[in-house]
Amino acid sequence: NPTDFRLLIDEYHILLKAYSYRQKAVDGVLDSFRKYKSFCFMSATPISADFTPSILSDVELVEAKWDNTDTLIVKLDQTNHPYVKAANYINAYKKDGYLEINGNKSTEAYFFINSVTDIASILEYCQLGNEEVKIVCADNPSNRNKLAGYTISNSRSANKPFTFITSKSFEGADYFSETGMCFVVSNSSNTNTLLDISTDIYQIAGRIRTESNPFRNTMVHIFNSVGKRKLNL
């Protein structure tokens, strides 16, 4: 009986993002949430008022105000060939075993790319071995076929020098690394990799939880406005 329970919908902005392919499930939530003893829709990146479903228009909005907040630094790296640029960063890590930024050395790189096909291309081009990479994506036959020779992991698996993450873990997954650096890769010719700056960027920025990590609040966004999808090398 729903009236015996309280309902909490965490990361509720995903309801809007997922509506195109999970319409029945999302409608089920929106049609039934008022039946519960109480309800709460919660997110660190709430839906803009312009796009909030009308059924939520009369729900009280409570905004948490924090006394101390971190400033996110996004380093923009525009290029005609985003995957080549990502490969260059990987090769720089491999050459010296680290990437030095402002006197701090990063020994682990986290690449957020929402395309298993493109991740596989980068792995092949950079000649990365299974022991060097952690790949976090949906574990299904299609992805296993694309990533033949590589293990599909989860966020709790042991750290590797290079971690590749699809939208499966853009939200709700925590990573712990003393020197991990976040790289977001977007390609204008592959819509799967395009990000919502009001939600995705902020969610990705909070994935590495280790407070002592000097790169915790820094992110490199590799992107293009024109160019081809493939590495073509």
Identify the function of each model-found stretch.
Residues 1-2, 43, 162-182, 203-214:
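SF2 helicase motor core recognition
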Residues 2-38:
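SF2 helicase catalytic motif II
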Residues 11-15, 169, 188:
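Conserved Walker B
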Residues 44-95:
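Interdomain hinge/linker at the junction between the two RecA-like core domains of SF2 helicases
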Residues 89-126:
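Conserved strand-helix element at the start of the C-terminal RecA-like helicase core
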Residues 134, 140-166:
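Conserved helicase ATPase core of P-loop NTP-dependent helicases/translocases
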Residues 189-217:
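Conserved SF2 helicase motif VI
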Residues 220, 225-233:
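A conserved SF2-helicase RecA2
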